[in-house]
């Protein structure tokens, strides 16, 4: 797929006087599996559980990748017990898609439910008022989909309007915001529940001496789910917005198809990321910002707050350097990367939640 840049112009709105018109985020909820791994000790665990301890040079290379990642810990559904029960997950090229699918189809909706319940609780309105559900995950494909299963788990109305998005990767978080904005602004009285849930079982496998990209994948990704309530027309006195979604845009950078590729195979989801990705993003992001903010007379990138998807530490560093941003601008993104790793579609929503928490503390 081509490299995709998403820009959402969000206005911090507790003090906003005019709330009618644009879609707003009314609540955010997040959830992670209870199990987590320490990034400093993960190389030992990974090479032991995959029976690869004899690959000493490869293990040291993986340790260096983990140390440079700026990730402190990651939450994972995969436990040692689960891996021992399913040893075919631990070999690089082992046929294992059925095993992965069986786990994901059951667990993804459950994790999504945890995040959704937190968002609904913060929203404070009856669950029966939800009119739309949009669900996305890169973790498994099934029919009926995770949206259908979540509808049952939450007890949503059988008439709720559902949309399921699979295999959108890191792009999906911003894409879901854009989709929710369009739905909310096109349906008076609509209350859109957005859920992004990711479990990385599909990408876990043992090391390969030929595929260094695999080591990056084993170091980078974590499991988590995020949910939001989005609507355009508030009920005075009953709902309080967190963010206003003013505009949205998406851009494809030409001739970048080879830079980032994930393919679903019998061995699970394979991962390829070229070393050029941080540079490609850094070199193209400002053009997107100019197009997004020029109508509002904004050209100082340090004058706005940032909810940046922390795809990896090198990406964050390169974009920050290219735009001349102060160190505080990506603080929320770096904190999410440190505490959770790259959560794929859910990552930008975790960052949005972290931003609003930090903003409240700073008020």
Swiss-Prot record:
EC numbers for this chain: 2.3.1.74
Name used for this protein in its record: Chalcone synthase B
Similarity comment: family membership: Belongs to the thiolase-like superfamily. Chalcone/stilbene synthases family.
Pfam families hit by this protein: Chal_sti_synt_C, Chal_sti_synt_N
Catalysed reaction equations from the record: (E)-4-coumaroyl-CoA + 3 malonyl-CoA + 3 H(+) = 2',4,4',6'-tetrahydroxychalcone + 3 CO2 + 4 CoA
Active-site feature positions: 170
Pathway(s): Secondary metabolite biosynthesis; flavonoid biosynthesis
One record GO biological process: polyketide biosynthetic process
Residues spanning the membrane: none
Keyword Acyltransferase: yes
Function: The primary product of this enzyme is 4,2',4',6'-tetrahydroxychalcone (also termed naringenin-chalcone or chalcone) which can under specific conditions spontaneously isomerize into naringenin.
Keywords, sorted A to Z: Acyltransferase, Flavonoid biosynthesis, Transferase
């Amino acid at each position: 797929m081509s490299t995709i840049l998403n820009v959402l112009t969000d206005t911090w709105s507790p003090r906003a006087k005019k709330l009618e018109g644009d879609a707003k985020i009314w609540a955010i909820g997040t959830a992670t599996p209870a199990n987590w791994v320490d990034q400093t000790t993960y190389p030992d665990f990974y090479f032991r559980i995959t029976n690869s301890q004899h690959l000493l040079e490869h293990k040291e290379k993986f340790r260096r990748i983990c140390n440079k990642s700026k990730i402190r810990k990651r939450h994972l559904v995969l436990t040692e017990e689960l891996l021992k029960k399913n040893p075919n997950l631990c070999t690089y090229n082992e046929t294992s898609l059925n095993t992965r699918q069986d786990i994901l189809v059951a667990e993804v909706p459950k994790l999504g439910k945890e995040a959704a319940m937190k968002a609904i609780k913060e929203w404070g309105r009856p669950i029966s008022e939800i009119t739309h559900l949009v669900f996305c995950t890169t973790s498994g494909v099934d029919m009926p989909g995770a949206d259908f299963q979540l509808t049952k788990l939450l007890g949503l109305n059988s008439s709720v309007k559902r949309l399921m998005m699979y295999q959108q990767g890191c792009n999906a978080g911003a894409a879901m915001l854009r989709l929710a904005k369009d739905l909310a602004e096109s349906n008076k009285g609509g209350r859109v529940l957005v859920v992004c849930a990711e479990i990385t079982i599909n990408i876990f496998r043992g090391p390969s001496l030929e595929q260094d990209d695999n080591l990056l994948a084993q170091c980078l990704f974590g499991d988590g789910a995020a949910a939001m309530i989005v609507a355009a027309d508030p009920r005075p006195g009953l709902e309080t917005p967190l963010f206003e979604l003013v505009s949205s845009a998406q851009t494809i950078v030409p001739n970048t198809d080879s830079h980032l590729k994930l393919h679903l195979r019998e061995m699970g989801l394979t991962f390829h990321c070229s070393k050029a990705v941080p540079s490609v993003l850094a070199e193209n992001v400002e053009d997107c910002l100019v197009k997004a903010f020029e109508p509002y007379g904004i050209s100082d990138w340090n004058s706005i707050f940032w909810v940046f998807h922390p795809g990896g530490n090198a990406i964050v560093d390169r974009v920050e350097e290219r735009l001349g941003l102060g160190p505080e601008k990506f603080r929320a993104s770096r904190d999410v990367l440190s505490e959770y790793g790259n959560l794929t579609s859910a990552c930008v929503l975790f960052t949005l939640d972290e931003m609003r928490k930090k903003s409240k503390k700073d008020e």
